[in-house]
UniProtKB/Swiss-Prot annotation:
Gene3D superfamilies: Aldolase class I, Golgi alpha-mannosidase II. One of its GO terms (molecular function) is alpha-galactosidase activity. One of its GO terms (cellular component) is extracellular region. InterPro entries: Aldolase_TIM, Glyco_hydro_27, Glyco_hydro_27/36_CS, Glyco_hydro_b, Glycoside_hydrolase_SF, Melibiase_C. It catalyses: Hydrolysis of terminal, non-reducing alpha-D-galactose residues in alpha-D-galactosides, including galactose oligosaccharides, galactomannans and galactolipids. The gene is aglB. Its EC number is 3.2.1.22. Belongs to the glycosyl hydrolase 27 family. This is Probable alpha-galactosidase B.
Length: 442
């Protein structure tokens, strides 16, 4: 039986000790950007990518900190590589000026550009991938002006699969994970097994080394779905690493991923961040409250915030969520790298692994907000009250005594809620989240 890592693990496991440190601070803070996949899937071309870049500026997203415009799967010729150079060939029907032409135009807008490949023989959509061609592809990416690589885990040949299976309690791997354990896992690793020696780690390290060998700094985003206990080696390999299978614009999937990622927060710090996948804000049939909770949790966890909706048709409410200044300020804190942590589960007893009801109470220190970030989440299907008790919040409990008051600000409205004594109670609609800055004592 294998158990998912919890926040109670030793702080010696925190990211940073063996981090992949890049020039100019690239990857020190979690990435902010946009990606084609959740909006368009394989139906991409230069026009859609450039429209997203232009809208990133027009909508004020660049000013809010979003900087990467990322091209996901399906950008190349599907039939194979150039027979002479062995390079991947951009699809000229989709990208008439090549990837370099698009990259140049994006750079002219003051933004950065990302590309996609996989640590296998083909991508998830069946296009040429980079296993065995890492050096050639890294050189191509650098020559084209690429700033970000999302590196997936599809097309892995049998000789590159892992000897053992790691516990990833995600619905993409089954449905029976009692409190985050994997009792039915096939071929579990020995207790002392070093996953950094696994084939998965070696496949991802090969591209890391190739990227480090080119004359361009390229942020490296691992998309290995939480496999091979990536949390124990991902920080030395890439700037972020996926912790689960793919997200979808379904509330049940969003809270499932939030639950899984919440147990991995001790691995997040400067230069390395567990990645619960790209944002679905603005997609599907999510309610306003669900969009808000999704974004607030991802920002509080200091996950990469990669927008995945069509920006030329986004509505004002969704745009306002993506541009929320206090949450982005917490997310991009230059002094404090650690994310918010759950301090109370609320609906469940503490430390309960529940795909439908993640931890509901979160807090985190901030050098930018003038106080502590506090989230209260209603995971239930009807309106409920939630109460933040100052003496329960780790950042406040040493100074909070009965009758203690703090200046409180509502992050969503910007409203100064005044001097609040002892606790703050709020009624939340189904799947909504309260976000507060708890500031100076009063």
């Amino acid at each position: 039986m294998q158990r998912y890592i919890s926040l109670s693990v030793s702080l010696s496991l925190l990211s940073g000790a063996n981090a992949l440190v890049r020039p100019d601070g690239v990857g020190r803070l979690p990435a902010l950007g946009w990606n084609t996949w959740n909006a368009f899937g394989c139906d991409i071309d230069a026009s859609k990518v450039l429209t997203a870049a232009e809208e990133t500026i027009n909508l004020g997203l660049k000013d809010a900190g979003y900087e990467y415009i990322n091209i996901d799967d399906c950008w190349s010729v599907k039939s194979g590589r150039d027979p002479n150079t062995k390079r991947i060939i951009p699809d000229s029907a989709k990208f008439p000026d090549g990837i370099s032409g698009v990259a140049s135009k994006i750079h002219d807008l003051g933004l950065k550009v990302g590309i996609y490949s996989s640590a296998g023989t083909e991508t998830c959509a069946g296009y040429p991938a980079s296993l065995g061609y890492e050096k050639i592809d890294a050189e191509s990416f650098a020559e084209w002006g690429i700033d970000y690589l999302k590196y997936d885990n599809c097309g892995v040949p049998t000789n590159w699969t892992d000897t053992y299976t790691h516990c990833v309690p995600d619905n993409s791997n089954g449905s029976k994970f009692p409190n985050g354990t994997c009792p039915d896992i096939s071929n579990p690793a020995p207790t002392a097994y070093d996953w950094s020696s696994s084939n998965t780690a070696q496949r991802y390290n090969a591209m890391r080394d190739a990227l480090l060998g080119v004359n361009r700094t390229i942020l490296y985003s691992l998309c290995e779905w939480g496999q091979a206990d990536v949390n124990t080696w991902g920080n030395g390999t890439g700037n972020s690493w996926r912790t689960t299978g793919d997200i979808t614009p379904d509330w049940s999937r969003i809270v499932e991923i939030a639950n899984e990622n919440s147990f991995l927060m001790n691995y997040a710090d400067f230069w390395g961040y567990p990645d619960p996948d790209m944002l679905e804000v603005g997609n599907g049939n999510l309610t306003l409250e669900e969009n808000r909770a999704h974004f607030a949790l991802w920002a509080a966890m200091k996950s990469p915030l990669i927008i995945g909706t069509a920006l030329d048709s986004i509505n004002e409410e969704h745009l306002a969520i993506l541009k929320n200044k206090p949450l982005l300020s917490f997310h991009q804190d230059p002094v404090i790298g650690r994310p918010a942590y759950p301090y109370k589960w609320g609906y469940n007893p503490d430390w309960t692994f529940d795909p439908a009801h993640p931890a509901e109470y979160w807090s985190g220190p901030s050098s930018t907000l003038g106080g502590t970030l506090v989230l209260m989440f209603n995971s239930e299907d009807s309106a409920k009250h939630r109460t933040a008790v100052w003496s329960e919040i780790p950042e406040l409990k040493d100074s909070a005594e009965k009758g203690s008051g703090y200046r409180v600000t509502d992050i969503w409205t910007g409203e100064d809620l005044g001097c609040v004594k002892d606790q703050y109670d709020v009624e939340l609609q189904s799947h909504d989240i309260a976000a507060l800055v708890v500031g100076e004592s009063c």
